Amino acid sequence: MNEAGHVSEETYSERIARAEPQFGDILYSREGTYFGIAAEMPRNQRVCLGQRMVLIRPNPAKINSRFLRLWLNSPILSRHIHGFRDGTVAERLNMPTIRGLPVPIFQRDDQNAIAELLGAIDDKIELNRRMNETLEAMAQAIFRDWFVDFGPTRRKIDGAPDPFEIMGGLVADPDRARQMADLFPASMGDNGLPEGWHHDRLGNLVTNVIERCVPSEMTRDRPYVPIDTITARSLVIQETRPGSEAQSSLIAFRQNDILFGAMRPYFHKVALAHFEGTTRTTVFVLRPKIASDLGFALMTINDGTTIEYATQHSSGTTIPYAVWRNSLERMLVPCPPREVRVRFGHILEPMLNRMQASASQNRTLSATHDLLLPKLMSGEIRLRDVEARLEAAQ
């Protein structure tokens, strides 16, 4: 539900003519990118279905809706439905097949317990995801106010007397707000930047590092992060693959390198690596030339202006690729004095650490969820057997 589109009231009314989704319903994708994926209808939201979706309304007297959603998303049922696909270009399930999908028979108490157990993992994953969204929004707000809109300088020009006000209310600590406000000039220069700032090339801020490697014991022991595992518009790596899957066109990255999705750059895939690993040449590995510039460099590369520049100057028509040499590296970016960049990094660092910790926990929780789900659904293990594993994941 995180990437739902929006429709007009007229379209909404047309699409709910037969049935309006309500809390407890299951929304099931029978075709396309999300083939075979089920989602629960959330509380207090108005939702209508697209043409590739099916509304399933569980009988509450017979089945727990969350349990049914878990079953529909289980590897067991996934293997089952792939034998009934009737599409050649796009995967598709017809309605008779959906109506005939098998559902395991569990006592209602067992259904509720499984739903509560695995649902708690899902809820924690979602809480971490939302927390990271909030932290990233805060980081972007500070970056854009300071380095795109030049808010502190403009507020000084407008006569703002209070450091908290000068910093746009984005620095809560009074002492830190005063120290930061003192670093921003009270006038704009002829170059359109705060007095004393200058434009510099992106290539003078970061280096595009290409450390090629081949499948080996080293790559097998490190996480593998191909471009499709990098989440769009997320500053941290949320998903990795086993190093054994790293087979060709490989490049290594280090902790605190910045991964930039070069293939189809408009997808806006930028993430900070908090571990050593391997990716492919469809990703730029950008390393700050000065370690203390990490936060400023990360947010500069993540800014929409950089993504737009990379997209407009990409090569290829069917599959565009960003070009670093003599192109993206030459993009001009505002460059404040080093002390401003360092102070910004100090503010950003705890946010990034929190985001990385949440992402790491989510990977552990997801792995635990994926391990338990088929075993619980098949009866291979019982609920009492999983308590120790869940405690370790928490």
Task: Indicate where each model-derived feature is located.
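Basic, amphipathic alpha-helical recognition segments used for DNA target recognition
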Residues: 1-3, 17, 23, 42-46, ...
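Sequence-specific dsDNA recognition surfaces
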Residues: 1-26, 183-188, 203-255, 279-280
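A generic structural signal for residues embedded in beta-strands
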Residues: 28-29, 259-261
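Non-catalytic accessory segments of hydrolases
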Residues: 32-33, 223, 265
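Short, Lys/Arg- and Gly-enriched loop/turn segments at beta-strand edges
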Residues: 34-41, 267-273
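Short aromatic/hydrophobic "clamp" motif used to bind/position activated sugar donors
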Residues: 51-53, 256, 281-283
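Non-catalytic DNA-recognition/assembly elements of restriction-modification systems
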Residues: 100-104, 108-150, 174-214, 338-345, ...
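Extended, domain-scale alpha-helical bundle/helix-rich regions
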Residues: 127, 149, 153, 158-167
